[in-house]
Amino acid sequence: FRYKLLAQEASIFRKLTVEDNLRAILQTRNLSKKEQDKKIDDLLEEFNITHIRTRLGMQLSGGERRRVEIARGLALEPHFILLDEPFAGIDPLAVADIQGIISYLKERGMGILITDHNVRETLQIVDRAYIMNSGQILLEGDSDTIANSELARKFYLGEDFKL
């Protein structure tokens, strides 16, 4: 059973190209250079980042960086992925892009756990959500249950919250 944590903080190598960021991870696996090249091409295509292949990590926008981090994490072929604040520090178009990637990963059967304070963006894509207060689970349920809960509104969402 393999899992991958993608932290909120940038985790790509800033002075390496996107391609070399992917290769750095693939070199930890027992793959030939030809197999690495094929996997890199596949990941670049799958996550729509072929056009930034030769750009340095420090030159990427927040959304591009997030897509590269996800692709890099999936190079290890995990069964489960933990996303910490995936919507932090990215523009609205990138949010929609990351939501699409998460939905795609769900369709592939990958287990996904998201921790995020951007509740609206998160509730739009999850099957189940948990609201915590003081380290305890206050409420759990599907997105509609959470969004319509008086308890969630009182302690976290606010009275005017709408999905």
What is each PLM-predicted segment?
Residues K15-R23:
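Short coil-to-helix segment of the ABC ATPase nucleotide-binding domain corresponding to the Q-loop/switch region
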Residues R23, K34-I52, G100-S103, L151:
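Conserved ABC ATPase "signature" region
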Residues L56-L60, E64:
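Conserved ABC ATPase signature
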Residues I70:
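Hydrophobic anchor residue at the start of the ABC signature
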Residues E77:
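Conserved catalytic motifs of ABC-family nucleotide-binding domains
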Residues I81-D84:
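Catalytic Walker B motif of ABC-type/P-loop ATPase nucleotide-binding domains
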